[in-house]
Amino acid sequence: MAPNLRKSHPLLKMINNSLIDLPTPSNISAWWNFGSLLGICLMTQILTGLLLAMHYTADTTLAFSSVAHTCRNVQYGWLIRNLHANGASFFFICIYLHIGRGFYYGSYLYKETWNTGIILLLTLMATAFVGYVLPWGQMSFWGATVITNLFSAIPYIGQTLVEWAWGGFSVDNPTLTRFFALHFLLPFAIAGLTLIHLTFLHESGSNNPLGIVSNCDKIPFHPYFTLKDILGFTLMFLPLTSLALFSPNLLGDPENFTPANPLVTPPHIKPEWYFLFAYAILRSIPNKLGGVLALAASVLVLFLSPFLHKAKQRTMTFRPLSQLLFWILVTNLFILTWVGSQPVEHPFIIIGQLASITYFTILLILFPIIGTLENKMLNF
């Protein structure tokens, strides 16, 4: 009998073990769809980005008009650009839901998978930031100026670091050129990190909603989960294409329709919606260095999740107190996002400060306490 090529060929064997014959827990819910959705988001972004790069000019005098040219004169250029811009939003929606699922179901106990995931998040944030600068509109320019300027808060080397990043004494042509180079490069770094992320995941196997070992009840990935993933793709592409076709500028800033002008500061500088929660935490501290540290901590705190898990049960499925705390945290993140979009004035300042304190208190103090308390309740 001839050997099955799918199982014997060196390359196909790897694909087979990762996507076809992979033993998968039979009870994983739709919350486990976001990994594959992130994969399809990445592929879509790389494809649309490549097509946009063919028509883009990384020069301060031409960048804005080259984007306008793409939208007006290139065949379906408007659609490619709208899909790329809104695809970034969907990428972040998926990654936040993916992290939320990992947090709720205790997936962070697979430490290597979790840590590579956080590195992926940081790389994605860097990619989105440098990408937002490329159209060279007002918010692009001032966003780049404000965020890169934060590095000057680093003692001793800060100012040198900022000027090195800018390639001069202000955000100018060298900055735009290097940001374009980075924006082109980083998605491929994300693709490479994704393979590492998957390698670590397949080392342990997927977690499941019950958080128990599922070796006794596994089914092949194909056809069951390939079909489920295709349904997920459809359900994601539907709102993405609807947004790109009917309301492409809904999530953007009107300020970015004005070409960058270093002499005119926009009344309210703010990043894209997916960074607003971190921006609100940054603004809630009146000290520059303190704000930068809080901003970094808002994401890096995720690295501590495996060490702050005190509960005997892995998931929150049967832990109502932790569930309540989790949803308070989610609500708190929505409040931070809203505050980040508001001007720096009363009452938004105090709301932002309270929400920032609540964010860190829940993650660092309340979750371990509630976990320990629930352990005690198990003994009654």
From Swiss-Prot:
GO cellular component: mitochondrial inner membrane; respiratory chain complex III
One GO MF term: ubiquinol-cytochrome-c reductase activity
PROSITE patterns: CYTB_CTER, CYTB_NTER
Transmembrane segments: 34-54, 78-99, 114-134, 179-199, 227-247, 289-309, 321-341, 348-368
Cofactor details (free text): Binds 2 heme b groups non-covalently.
Binding site for a ubiquinone: H202
Residues binding heme b b562: H84, H183
One Pfam family matching this protein: Cytochrome_B
CDD domains: cytochrome_b_C, Cytochrome_b_N
Keywords: Electron transport, Heme, Iron, Membrane, Metal-binding, Mitochondrion, Mitochondrion inner membrane, Respiratory chain, Transmembrane, Transmembrane helix, Transport, Ubiquinone
Cofactors named for this entry: heme b
Top-rank taxon: Eukaryota
Subcellular localization(s) per the UniProt record: Mitochondrion inner membrane
Bilayer topology annotation: Multi-pass membrane protein
Broad class of where this protein is predominantly found: mitochondrion
Biological process according to GO: mitochondrial electron transport, ubiquinol to cytochrome c
Extra remark: Heme 1 (or BL or b562) is low-potential and absorbs at about 562 nm, and heme 2 (or BH or b566) is high-potential and absorbs at about 566 nm.
Oligomeric form and interacting partners: The cytochrome bc1 complex contains 11 subunits: 3 respiratory subunits (MT-CYB, CYC1 and UQCRFS1), 2 core proteins (UQCRC1 and UQCRC2) and 6 low-molecular weight proteins (UQCRH/QCR6, UQCRB/QCR7, UQCRQ/QCR8, UQCR10/QCR9, UQCR11/QCR10 and a cleavage product of UQCRFS1). This cytochrome bc1 complex then forms a dimer.
Job description of the protein: Component of the ubiquinol-cytochrome c reductase complex (complex III or cytochrome b-c1 complex) that is part of the mitochondrial respiratory chain. The b-c1 complex mediates electron transfer from ubiquinol to cytochrome c. Contributes to the generation of a proton gradient across the mitochondrial membrane that is then used for ATP synthesis.
Protein name: Cytochrome b
Organism: Fulmarus glacialoides
